[in-house]
Amino acid sequence: IVAKNKIFPKFKIDMWQEKFNRDGVDRSRFSMDFYYPFLAGIKNNKKEFLNLLDNYYIKGLGVKCVAEEPWVTIAESSECVISALIHDNEDIAKDIFNDIQQFQNNDGIFPTGYQYDMEIFWPEENSTWTNAAVIIAAHALSFFDSDCNESSVNVFLELRNFFKSN
């Protein structure tokens, strides 16, 4: 009902920025701790998003899970695609999504991750959450490449509009 009527509650964004890293542990090495605040609308600076993305994005492969580790994960890449879309970084979102397509197997399944120094899939699994993240990212992207610009049919466009209004 909220999205349909376009009535968005006002969140205390400052409070969420303060509480996001409440335990004091430095999580700057994990990509999800970079893009989740953007995904949630806690942060919304496009330049900051792009600067932080440089620490994790390996062009041609996807988004690393951990900054210092030589592996990309498909779920993190897909979630980062959605974060990029919400904050008007459509070209980057499309690049990342296109990068991960090479990892889809003949059955249409994506692996959890790829260790690029050793050129192996790691961990050796095809997790359901990874494949769900790819589907959600594909849904989000599909509306940016079509003639349908109705934000009411795309939850991610609704999120972008919501975050811009707060």
What do these predicted ranges mean?
Residues 3-73, 95-166:
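Extended glycan-interaction surfaces of carbohydrate-active proteins
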